[in-house]
Regions:
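Active-site-proximal beta-alpha loop/turn segments in soluble metabolic enzymes
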Residues: 1-5
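Histidine-acidic metal/acid-base catalytic patches
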Residues: 8-30, 34-134
Length: 134
């Protein structure tokens, strides 16, 4: 899914493509930011199960800029924005999904940090954001 793309910017279109692929291992690569950017409701993820939800890009987004203007570089560490992170995790668990969470950030402020520090903070923020939902 790619939130800014008209062809594959919503959960529904990405799932449609995976279904139409007809491959037994086809799945959905979700992303917190792209779900928001594309205008999908996070509750749509509850319609998917473990087969479709194997990996999910984990990040957050601020309240400003608005959806129409937000860009990849505006992503922030999980828990530092306004995304419904706890609800997303609870939704995964409701459908029996335990996807691998992959931190994906394109924030130049983080890129300017020493790599190990950025990674350490990222792992801590990921763990904390999931723990709040459990």
């Amino acid at each position: 899914m790619w939130g800014g793309n008209k062809s594959i910017g919503r959960v529904s279109t990405a799932i449609y493509i995976a279904l139409e692929a007809g491959h037994p291992n086809a799945c959905f690569l979700g992303d917190v930011y792209h779900t928001y950017k594309g205008g999908s409701d996070f509750d749509a993820l509850k319609m998917l199960g473990p087969q479709a939800l194997q990996v999910f890009h984990w990040n957050d987004y601020p309240s400003n800029p608005p959806r129409e203007k937000i860009g990849d570089g505006d992503r922030v560490y999980p828990g530092d924005g306004v995304a419904p992170i706890s609800d997303i995790v609870k939704g995964f668990l409701q459908v029996g999904a335990t996807p691998v969470l992959s931190l994906e950030l394109f924030n130049k402020k983080y890129w300017a940090m020493p790599p190990l520090e950025a990674a350490r903070i990222g792992i801590e923020k990921m763990k904390a954001s999931v723990a709040l939902a459990l």
